[in-house]
């Protein structure tokens, strides 16, 4: 029970997901190389201008990367923030920020993503084509597809 409380602290708050209102929330998580921390300043400045408050934020330092072609972790900083979907201008701001993130060599965590442009995914994940080739080999008829995979052109 103690481990569950530690690993899932929000579960101790009744209906924590309602804090963002009926429109719900999105979780935005990215990783950036050490030495590229100025991207945080740009993010926070823009979110402050939007008056977008996050109920939950987590900053972690990552170590080694996995060998998987679409692996998210790599050496650097990862930041996760939750935001209300009702924040005016948030979607446009994040679209613009995604471009800056790519320019800085960063990438979005695809598992938690619901909005990134499919054109940016190969730029964020240099081994994207390797993933597609593995996928074609393992599932040549394209039987196994998710909505997200179709949206991001992963299949």
State the predicted function of each range:
Residues 2-123:
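Substrate-recognition/cap regions that form aromatic- and gly/pro-loop-enriched pockets
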Residues 102-155:
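Activity-critical C-terminal alpha-helical subdomain
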